[in-house]
Amino acid sequence: MRTKVLIIDEVSMVDGELFDKLEELARKIRNNGRPFGGIQLVVTGDFFQLPPVPESNREAKFAFDSATWNTSIQHTILLNHVFRQKDPVFASMLNEMRLGKLTPATIDAFKKLSRPLDFHDSLEATELWVYQVKFSGSI
């Protein structure tokens, strides 16, 4: 097998059960008892952003709660410099929201951003639905 590195982007969306299955599959395919069959694993993502996507009718389990996470992940590098937001005050507000710990000042600042939208054309805002059941009931 030629694969040397497996990169998993948005690892927060990978269910723990799937992570364990991938690890086992890699060991079997490569006939190698090391984690992921000796394939170097590079995972990226923010567990505060996108939750795991489990199989239907099963509770989600984060990849870091999987049985094989601790043996598969050797090093963790925390990236804490924000590149996409240049306003440090707003970046701090977004980080508070990300952590779910908003100060009263941040809540007030977000409330001040609320305003009625005035459409001068016939276009309406797009509605996004997380679950098909909710979408079906909205028609």
Task: List the predicted regions and their residue ranges.
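Conserved ATP-binding/catalytic motifs of P-loop helicase motor domains
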Residues: 1-139
